[in-house]
Amino acid sequence: MSEARQILVTSALPYANGSIHLGHMLEYIQTDMWVRFQKLRGNQCIYVCADDAHGSAIMLRAEKEGITPEQLIANVQAEHSADFADFLVNFDNFHSTHSPENRELAELIYTRLRDAGHIATRSVTQYFDPEKGMFLADRFIKGTCPRCAAEDQYGDNCEKCGATYEPTELKDPRSAISGATPVLKDSKHFFFKLPDFEAMLKEWTRGGALQESVANKIAEWLDGGLQEWDISRDAPYFGFEIPGEPGKYFYVWLDAPIGYMASFQNLCKRRPELSFDAFWSKESSAELYHFIGKDIINFHTLFWPAMLEGAGFRKPTAVNVHGYLTVNGQKMSKSRGTFIKARTYLDHLNPEYLRYYYASKLGRGVDDLDLNLDDFVQKVNSDLVGKVVNIASRCAGFIHKGNDGVMVEANPEPELWAAFQAAAPSIADAYEARDFARAMREIMALADRANAWIADKAPWALNKVEGKQAEVQEICALGVNLFRQLVIFLKPVLPNLAAAAEQFLNVAPLSWDDHATLLANHKLNAFTPLMTRIEPAKIDAMIEASKEDLAASEAAVPAGNGELAKAPLAAEINFDTFAAVDLRIALIEKAEFVEGADKLLRLTLNIGDATRNVFSGIKSAYPDPSKLEGRLTLYVANLAPRKMKFGMSEGMVLAAGPGGSEIYLLSPDNGAKPGQRVM
């Protein structure tokens, strides 16, 4: 047997400013399954995480609730911990970035970077809220767009016309926090010299640590030239003060990944057999894996390895990136009841249903995963209840009734048993490669073979034939052994089902190596149902409860939906003014990200006999722009072209919604054709 590996695994830190939802759970379930597989194989695999507990958002929410930030993050951590535990996510340690360990490590890494010449300082001019006494990030500044005069726009981007600009260009700026008129003020900021590590990053990102598509994306940033990274924020700020710099704080993304190290260090204090340096020193032979979403790859594949390199620590073995979660083919929606909190799900359904469904769809890539609720019900009921559990329920009764619960020593179908044995290495390889979907397909193919064999032998019919009872016992003994095999293969995904099966099988906790053995002359415990089918009514109840979550979280609204109160009707215009706007149907032929733009997508539009290029500020609502391709939309064709730093924008597309994730691109009814005029 090969020597046990030493592995440290992390998931991205959940922000301590709200509840966990099913989109978050995708990552933690994915990570937990991989960790459980490693432990099942006998490796030393340690899984740590923490709440990301710093930043202005937490400070402001705590102020709004009339509590301290410390009280807020303690309350949220208790909620997060309960949700994770009930979803069977088994951290070895779940800590907080607001901890003595994280402060100590953040200061250590910063001072090492500073002393090595990797920190720069310079003056930055920013808007300052004189009423709150704080500098304002772009998202905390609102005003009138300098391009289209739309009101209530953010400090760097107009969500109506798609323009990007500097906060100082915004007309009638105001603080989104206090409503006060901000003033420009200079402040000393601290920058991490990321370009110092460009050569190292080019080599590391192409060295096998990243999925190919992620490495390709990072290469775009590297080829475009790296910029120094602003790592400081001014007081008031909830976080750690920079050593020797009163009133200056580490930006939340500086100390957040250090939280991985801090959580592990905290665990080391409670488990003296663990050594911090054995996992984090530059000479470490241990493996280090980060599981993250595709929205934060720049922090984990550029800033983080550069910080570690500059401070004399080891870099990650690999960073595993996953896509976003959609529900029923669309973004999670509060109004549709598909923005489902972890606790709302747990109030209605077994967590292992979702663990299995996620596993069945999680491959090696970074594609988005769709939770189709009809498919979810069908797959769980068919695979887990109809295939896996069905084998045990078919066979257990005959063994109890015919042989007092004792499995006979028999293998009446050596070829089938050998097929299960032969599949084990491939299933293990799929788990190791984090290709859970392939592992589930191979496991269910085995379950199909076992069920087909039992159906062909029909022990229920043989049991009625005199003299066939011994054959029935042999068939059912092998059936239970095949069930035991499937339980071993599924144990990383379904730990509760495995524990219940171990109780029925009357065995100690199963390890991966147990798949090579047959139970013989072995007494079983009484069989009880191991998993029940999903009732569609429970899905409906969960959706309704999610809508109620939304209603409960919103203050009472006036009659109607309140949209006119948010955006009053504009001044009346005559028909000629309206007719001057040339609205056309446009086919989106291509939709893509704009490098360097936080909120823009580049759309190539077919308007019948011509194509147009448009930049639109809808990125936040459409994280996978390729899904817009082939869709019809409404296009303002005679708007004067506008030169932007990313290129020329030739008109604009129409969308509704308040902004952020709630932007809804308008589409015509069926039958409309590109180029047709909208009247």
Swiss-Prot record:
Motif ('HIGH' region): 14-24
Domain tRNA-binding residue range list: 577-679
Reaction(s) this enzyme catalyzes, per UniProt: tRNA(Met) + L-methionine + ATP = L-methionyl-tRNA(Met) + AMP + diphosphate
GO biological process: methionyl-tRNA aminoacylation
EC number: 6.1.1.10
Matches recorded under Gene3D superfamilies: HUPs, Isoleucyl-tRNA Synthetase, Domain 1, Methionyl-tRNA synthetase, Zn-domain, Nucleic acid-binding proteins
Cofactor: Zn(2+)
Amino-acid positions noted as binding Zn(2+) in the UniProt annotation, renumbered to this chain: 145, 148, 158, 161
Principal subcellular localisation of the protein: cytoplasm
UniProt keyword list: Aminoacyl-tRNA synthetase, ATP-binding, Cytoplasm, Ligase, Metal-binding, Nucleotide-binding, Protein biosynthesis, RNA-binding, tRNA-binding, Zinc
Bound cofactor: record note: Binds 1 zinc ion per subunit.
PROSITE patterns for the chain: AA_TRNA_LIGASE_I (PS00178), TRBD (PS50886)
Pfam family, one: Anticodon_3
GO CC annotations, alphabetized: cytosol
Compartments where found: Cytoplasm
Motif position, 'KMSKS' region: 331-335
PANTHER family: METHIONINE--TRNA LIGASE (PTHR45765), METHIONINE--TRNA LIGASE, CYTOPLASMIC (PTHR45765:SF1)
Subunit structure of this chain's protein: Homodimer.
Family annotation (NCBIfam families): metG, metG_C_term, PRK00133.1
Protein name: Methionine--tRNA ligase
Upper lineage: Bacteria, Pseudomonadati, Pseudomonadota, Gammaproteobacteria, Pseudomonadales
